[in-house]
Amino acid sequence: EVNLKEGESIIVSAGLEEKSPASFKRQFEALLDSRIPRDSFEHCLQNSAQQFIIREKEGTRMFAGFPWFGSCGRDTLLSIPGLVLTTGDKKTFKELLKYLTDTMKGPFFSNRYYQKSLYYTAVDSPLWFFLILQKYEEMLGVSKKTVWKEYGEVMSKILNSFIEGTDFNIKTLDNGLLYAGNENLALTWMNVFCEGKPYTPRTGLNIEINALWYNALRYAVEVLKEADKKNTDIEKWNEVANRVEA
């Protein structure tokens, strides 16, 4: 039995190893400071948002959904503005993009993380990357020069690979539009398979893919105009964008 006076507190600790009681209060207060209080609707939303962020030895990822969905490059990029940028969390933003860019295979982001293995079957994820950089600039106030310094190499790899042609029969046609896939692949968000065959392969010229493609080209040109006017890619990307527009 312990008698407490008004304003006093007591810490109860249970564990498998003996700890120094002198550090309990400091550890408790540090943990309390790191938590988001549930004292408003906004704070409750922030707390719910951070529950989808997973920090592991391999890097920082985002769950696509509970209970069984793992991380997905497409869903991560789609969710970053709402879950991360709205709170101004630049640290988590950069951690998420570092994991995605560190685990790229050619111009592709991993679209599925399952049993410690990565799968790369999405044509749109690399293009969503450009829209996320636009949101990064818009919502956190970074400059185009900063965007290019941090992510210019990845931007170039994606655009040039798609222009020259790459895996999954992805290629730029004479009219500038982006062609992707074959009858045995499902490279867009409509990627349900049955008996080894995609229900909706959507081979060819998908409207939302080409909208993202055009946006990526135009945004990259805007960034280069401010960050590196002497870069020869600016003419190539602008020429392809003009063909798409025509």
Question: What are the roles of these predicted feature ranges?
Answer:
Residues 1-246:
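Acidic, mature catalytic/reactive cores of soluble proteins
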